[in-house]
């Protein structure tokens, strides 16, 4: 992609207007401190959360959006904050490691310092570090995990299933998992998960004929003498956003009434902390938190929002914390509760970026990833093209990756217009 002088000057003007630093060295403060991943334990109940990794076993380059407009009352509020506005809202120092993780600012220069993000071998190292400090901590997978890479397609999701087992996932919900088909989903849940004690929860998926629960709506666990309940919420619009023929006998939806029923039941059974593992998307979770009471925290996904701190949402009986943990294995949420007297007294939360340059790869996970990818290495390493421009795919309206796709469609097909639907989330 080549630019003439006028286009280059226009790009500079856009960059300046959007707050993009043209001198990256002026804004990049330096590497993260050695204590970056030191997160002292708080309280007696801990949850670790990742979501929407989209089958990315290896580290990736990932730039956060420079445009993320909220609609109506959501305008100018989390998760619809980018760049300097996000830094100001959450008190993050410009040029810091967190600034690189949560914003697009100085992306190219900072990426050279911190490296790629995510990768299950690096995520495994971080998960193990957090668990070593938090006896009994539960690892939650928010879904969109099995789908999104060539190897997940070629192995019928088995590469990701085995990786999640090795990672130590305790509880999972779903969205794109359904695209492997209902039979394959049930095969994995009833065999692979059952053998390892992993739970799959989704309170909002029922049969079309009699409305019976397809999956467990929630599970009860005990952590350091404290009973906790984890409810599941699969993506409510799966048969609309994805081909219905993959799950022809299942009905989805938000189903906040049934969710309230399950929350109340879990509380009646002695749950002192109740959390929701959700794939609604953050805006839906924020609304849901006003309607359903008794949930201490929502660990959200789907919209790929890396939000540094929870949003406190008031409802008729208290407050629910709403979080969202980004995508592509880039973040690990760490929520610590102090539970006493039958309820959550206080909490501390960190959304930790998984920087491949700062976290060593776990040897066993690294070996597994190399092994599972080895049969396909020739295909995976094939060079398709070389770009002379910066390609990214995050923003409400467009990105350079989307532009490349639609330009190609118009050139090859001779079309007057072309559209790229939703690629920004991938």
Regions found by a protein language model. Name each.
Residues 17, 91-92, 132, 194, ...:
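Generic surface-pattern signal
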Residues 360-426:
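Hard-cation-handling environments
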Residues 3-13, 19-356, 364, 396-408:
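Acidic, metal/ion-coordinating pockets
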């Amino acid at each position: 992609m080549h630019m003439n002088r006028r286009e280059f000057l226009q790009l500079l003007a856009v960059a300046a207007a959007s707050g993009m630093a043209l001198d990256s060295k002026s804004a990049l403060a330096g590497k993260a401190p050695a204590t970056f991943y030191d997160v002292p334990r708080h309280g007696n109940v801990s949850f670790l959360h990742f979501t929407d990794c989209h089958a990315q076993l290896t580290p990736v380059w990932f730039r956060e959006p420079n445009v993320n407009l909220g609609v109506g009352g959501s305008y100018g509020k989390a998760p619809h904050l980018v760049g300097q506005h996000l830094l100001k809202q959450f008190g993050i120092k410009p040029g810091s490691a967190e600034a690189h993780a949560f914003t697009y600012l100085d992306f190219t220069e900072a990426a050279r310092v911190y490296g790629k993000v995510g990768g299950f071998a690096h995520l495994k190292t971080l998960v193990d570090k957090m668990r070593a400090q938090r006896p009994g901590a539960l690892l939650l997978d928010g879904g969109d995990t099995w789908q999104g890479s060539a190897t997940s397609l070629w192995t019928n999701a088995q590469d990701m299933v085995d990786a999640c087992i090795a990672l130590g996932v305790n509880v999972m919900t779903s969205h794109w998992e359904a695209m492997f088909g209902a039979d394959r989903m049930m095969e994995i849940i009833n065999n692979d998960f059952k053998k390892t004690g992993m739970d799959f929860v989704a309170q909002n998926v029922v049969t079309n004929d009699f409305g019976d629960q397809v999956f467990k709506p929630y599970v009860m666990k005990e952590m350091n003498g404290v009973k906790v309940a984890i409810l599941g919420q699969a993506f409510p619009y799966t048969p609309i956003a994805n081909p219905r023929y993959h799950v022809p006998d299942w009905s989805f939806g938000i189903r906040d009434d049934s969710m309230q029923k399950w929350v109340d039941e879990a509380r009646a059974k002695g749950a002192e902390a109740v959390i929701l593992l959700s794939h609604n998307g953050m805006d839906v979770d924020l609304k849901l938190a006003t309607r359903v009471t008794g949930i201490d925290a929502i660990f959200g996904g789907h919209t790929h929002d890396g939000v540094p701190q929870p949003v406190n949402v008031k409802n008729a009986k208290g407050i629910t914390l709403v979080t969202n943990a980004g995508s592509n294995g880039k973040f690990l949420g760490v929520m610590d509760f102090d539970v006493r007297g039958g309820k959550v007294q206080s909490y501390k939360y960190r959304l930790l970026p998984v920087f491949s340059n700062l976290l060593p790869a776990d040897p066993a996970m690294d070996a597994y990833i190399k092994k599972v990818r080895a049969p396909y290495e020739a295909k995976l390493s094939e060079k398709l093209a070389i770009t002379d421009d910066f390609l990214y795919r995050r923003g409400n309206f467009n990105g350079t990756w989307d532009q490349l796709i639609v330009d190609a469609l118009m050139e090859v097909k001779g079309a007057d217009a072309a559209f790229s639907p939703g690629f920004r989330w991938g």
